[in-house]
From Swiss-Prot:
This is DNA-directed RNA polymerase subunit omega. Promotes RNA polymerase assembly. Latches the N- and C-terminal regions of the beta' subunit thereby facilitating its interaction with the beta and alpha subunits. One of its GO terms (molecular function) is DNA binding. It comes from Rhizobium meliloti (strain 1021) (Ensifer meliloti). The keyword Phosphoprotein does not apply. The gene is rpoZ.
Length: 135
């Protein structure tokens, strides 16, 4: 990579380690088919990503948010706050719920009991799954 390109980017992204993360993420996006915002000039994807950051055709903040979002396994969704009127109704609801529970008691659930020998016999009787080429 051209040193000039990296030095141009340091003005836009202060931390060089963060610059590497952002440029590598953008290079992966380009390799996956994301549109390029600068002329390619026969450069490879990491150089194109650095040039995009240096030319400020991409916001480093937006790129950072996109990187964080791509690394998250569980995305939290902001849910709207409940209005106070619904909170008053939910506070009164337990009193009504107790009365309704007394009237509509379902039968207790029962589970079959199994001895250890029966469990081991059942496990031994299992057929192993067919092998596949997935692993």
């Amino acid at each position: 990579m051209a040193r000039v390109t990296v030095e141009d980017c340091i003005d836009k992204v202060e931390n060089r380690f963060e610059l590497v993360l952002l440029a590598s993420h953008r290079a992966r996006l380009v390799s996956q088919g994301a549109p390029i915002t600068v002329d390619r000039d026969n450069d490879k994807n990491p150089v194109v990503a650095l040039r995009e950051i240096a030319d400020e055709t991409l916001s480093p903040g937006d790129l950072k948010e996109d990187l964080i979002h791509s690394l998250q396994k569980h995305v939290e969704v902001d849910e709207p706050e409940p209005d106070p009127a619904s909170l008053v109704q939910t506070e009164a609801a337990p009193a009504f719920a107790e009365a309704a529970e007394e009237e509509d008691q379902p039968e207790a659930l029962t589970f079959d009991r199994m001895s250890e020998e029966e469990l081991l016999a059942g496990i031994e009787g299992l057929v192993p799954p067919e092998k596949s080429d997935d692993y």
